[in-house]
Amino acid sequence: MAVFIGGTGTDVGKTFFSSLILGKYGESLGLKYFKPVQTGDDSDRITLMRLTGLHESYVLKNYYSLAFAGSPHYSSELEGTEIDTDELSRHLYSIRDEKIIIEGAGGLLVPLNRRMLTLEVIRQAEIPLILVAPTSLGAINQTLLSIEAIQNRNIDLKGIYFLGIPDKTTEDNIRTITEWSGVISLGSFFLNSNERISCECFQEECIPKFDLDESIKNILV
């Protein structure tokens, strides 16, 4: 089945998390990667292919590619167009039973046009969601707000995956978020810095450490 990878905000690590999934299970489970809406350059697809070493056949083309790196609703307006969220919802619904990792653009409440938020499209498409959350100061508020928005729309939230550079608040942040929300943690992955990770490091060090208890795999199969 398809799974939507959403985040509490921009740059929380959705592409890195998607790369971990595809790098570990792409070939064995026959997974594909799909980012329906891309703003700015095509760096997310390129990053995933660079890190995982997967052929471009594993990476589907964006449904919308917008030049300006901004919120999708605004980026599309600058190009004199509008994202057709009805069409996008129907397309996502049609692929919901396929083995596709679908990455969202920005946070969950990002508008795709002046009438529709990302979460509404996920709800209409009836696709389950994994929430990628940060681990540092501020994570509690961001994550609990995102979870509340998800639950208010009766979206199937499979769990939270924590990703980031740890600090003194990290351990308690994870505990507090799971206790207050009642949503399970699917795991965590800690980085040493924001520096660019080489494909060798990713494949030799990151992938072997990922999903040791197969919580993510069990969702995908």
Swiss-Prot record:
It comes from the Bacteria. Mg(2+) binds at T15, D44, E103. ATP binds at D11, V12, G13, K14, T15, F16, D44, E103, G104, A105, G106. Its EC number is 6.3.3.3. Keywords: ATP-binding, Biotin biosynthesis, Cytoplasm, Ligase, Magnesium, Metal-binding, Nucleotide-binding. It catalyses: (7R,8S)-7,8-diammoniononanoate + CO2 + ATP = (4R,5S)-dethiobiotin + ADP + phosphate + 3 H(+). The active site is at K35. InterPro entries: DTB_synth_BioD, P-loop_NTPase. GO terms for cellular component: cytosol. GO terms for biological process: biotin biosynthetic process. Substrate binds at T39. It is found in: Cytoplasm. Its cofactor is Mg(2+). Homodimer. Catalyzes a mechanistically unusual reaction, the ATP-dependent insertion of CO2 between the N7 and N8 nitrogen atoms of 7,8-diaminopelargonic acid (DAPA, also called 7,8-diammoniononanoate) to form a ureido ring. Belongs to the dethiobiotin synthetase family. This is ATP-dependent dethiobiotin synthetase BioD. It comes from Leptospira interrogans serogroup Icterohaemorrhagiae serovar Lai (strain 56601). The gene is bioD.
